[in-house]
Amino acid sequence: MENKKKKVVVAFSGGLDTSYTVMYLAKEKGYEVYAACANTGGFSAEQLKTNEENAYKLGAVKYVTLDVTQEYYEKSLKYMVYGNVLRNGTYPISVSSERIFQALAIARYANEIGADAIAHGSTGAGNDQIRFDMTFLVLAPGVEIITLTRDSNLSRQQEIDYLNANGFFADFTKLKYSYNVGLWGTSICGGEILDSAQGLPETAYLKHCTKEGSEQLRLTFEKGELKAVNDETFDDPIKAIQKVEEIGAAYGIGRDMHVGDTIIGIKGRVGFEAAAPMLIIGAHRFLEKYTLSKWQQYWKDQVANWYGMFLHESQYLEPVMRDIEAMLQESQRNVNGTAILELRPLSFSTVGVESKDDLVKNKFGEYGETQKGWTADDAKGFIKVTSTALRAYYANHKDEKENI
C-alpha cells in the first residue's frame, strides 16, 4: 500500500524564504505542498498572478489566494481607527496587525484541507515567528509547524543557489531596503534604519511628494467609520482608505520612524510611510474632541492603548480583546461629522469640524467669551468648592505651603 504523502500548507508570500520552503519541502521531503497567499490588501492582481505561476514552478500541487482584506478591516482596522491606535504615539501598527489575519487565514485553510503541517518563512529574530506560531498552536492544534529559515539558519545566497540549481530563477537581489507594503501603510527596514543616528533619505521611500502648495481634505465619519472623502461617499471602506492614501501620498504625508520593543525583548527601528492611516486617525481623533465627553476620551485612550499593545504582542485571540472592541464600538455612537484637514508637502494640520454632535456648540456658554448656564456667584461657589481638598491639605501642612 502506497504511503500517504504529508500534506503541508506553506504561507506563501512569493519572497525568497517562502519560495525556498515550497521547493525544499516538495523536492527534498516529497511533501504535498499547498501554497497559500493570505492577502490583507497589500498584493496587486499582478503580484498575485506571479505568485501563482511561481508556486507551481516551485513544486506546489495547489496554489490559493486567501483574500481576507474585508475581514482585516472589520475585525482590526475599524477598531484601530475607533481607538486612534498609534504604537508609542507614532506607528499605526501596519505590519503586526496584518500578520495576525494572515495567520488566521492560513490556519483556517490548513484545517479545511486536513493539513498535517504548516510552514512559514519567519526567521528567529523578529516578531512574526511568534504571531504565526501562536495562532497556529491555538487554532490548528496538533498540526506540525515547519520553519526552515529559522531552523536551518541558511543564508540568502544559499537559498538562491539551491533554487537556481533546481531550475528556478527569479530576481531575489538583496536590496538595500526591504519593504512590507500593506493597506494600512508600508514599513521600511534595512539601510540607515540599522544606525540609530541616521534617518532615511528620500530615495528610500516608495511614494514621493509630487504636489506643491496646499489643499483641504474633508473626511466624513458616521459612528466612527469613514464614509466619505471630499464629499464622495464610499460603500466600501477599503476603497475609502485607498482614496485617502492616494490623496495624502501625493504630498508625502505619513512618513516617520518608529522605535519600539519587540515581543522577544530587544528594541527595534522601522521606517514607514502611511498617509491614509495618519490622516484618517488624525481626522477621527480631531472629530472626537468635539463629540465625546472628557471622560469618554480619557478612558477610550487607556483601553485603546492596551488594544494596540495586545495586537502588536500577538494577543489578538485573548478574550479581553473582544471586550475592548465592544467598548470601542459603543464609544463611537456620537462620532458623526466631517473633519477638515489642511494638506501640504510632508505634513498636515487640523482646520475644523462640521457635526450635529458638536459639543462646542451648546446653550451654556462659549469658552473665554460668555456664560449662559450659570451666574457669577455660581462660578465663585464652584471654584471655592473645587479648592476645598487643596485648602484642607495645606491647612494641615503649612511647612509645605511655605516652600512652594
Language model regions located:
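Nucleotide-activated chemistry modules centered on ATP-dependent adenylation/adenylyltransferase
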Residues: 2-11, 16-404
